[in-house]
Amino acid sequence: MKKLEVFGANKLNGHINISGSKNASLPILAATLLSNKKVCLKNLPNVKDIHTMINLLQSLGSKTNFYNKKLIINNFKQKKNFASYSLVKTMRAGILVLGPLLAKFRNAKVSLPGGCAIGTRPIDIHLKALSKLGVKYKIVQGYVHATAPKGLIGSKISFPKISVGATENLIIAASQAKGTTVLSNCAIEPEIKDLVNFLISMGCSIKWIGKRKLKIDGVEETKETTYSVMFDRIEAGTYLIAAAITEGNLKINNLIPSIIKTEINILKKIGAKIRIKKNEVHIIGNKKIKSMNIKTAPYPGFPTDLQAQMMVLLCKGNNKSLIKEDIFENRFMHVAELNRMGAQI
């Protein structure tokens, strides 16, 4: 697509079903590498990163069949442990294959990741945590060369700061480590919990023993499973904000409202009328938008992935608003473009 032309001043009315979560699907796809059994994943979104991750799994030897949001994976002959730059460079989640490859083969060579330019997003937290499971690593010419000569060995690990990616990598790796691993200061995003639920469905032994604390008993074998990925809360939040911006009347289906209660509560305070049912949120936008201050934060705080959308909405506010970005240091690139359109930021 070279150009997308938007005709504004139209209200968003109607109803829409929310897609499966990309951010939940990617670590789950990486985790399938642990299994030598058939895995069936449902409700996968049809987006570029999903296809890239599937291509990465295929390059490692996985056999896949993706049709109508459903992916069947067979790893009977999966014996490769090299994740190339050509695939990992476009997607941050590519580094998530490091943990399962180490668990399966005791060594791996994985390219440093690429992805969107919204900050440094270093992987040092991943590597330092993996080293506590017995991993030795070095970075040579853009690749992580990692080995676990004695296999992965369970340990007590406390993340120095909350990291979604590091939490995911360690959960996957520890699921087949020898003994027990206790992870503290974990990210608790719904996508993390979806990953845990998927691994449990494969026969892994994982238990939450505190708000941000996990106990993982390593298993030698996994079992065949069928699993449906959770809804995309960022997509849901984007449609809710878009309805508020356009003063629309929108019903959003195929979601769990309690997971996005922070976003719902903020939209209510701003002036939107919202009704909630079991798997549905009905929003009616308001002409009068109340200004407010917002700070991004790890879940259950306001998500950084909705910060730009919320900024557009607050441009319509009745007073000054303040947005503080506490997750990434370079995520205000949209400000200049909004100012070109007449915003005062």
Predicted segments, located by residue:
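Short, structured segments at the rim of ligand-binding sites
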Residues: M1-I345
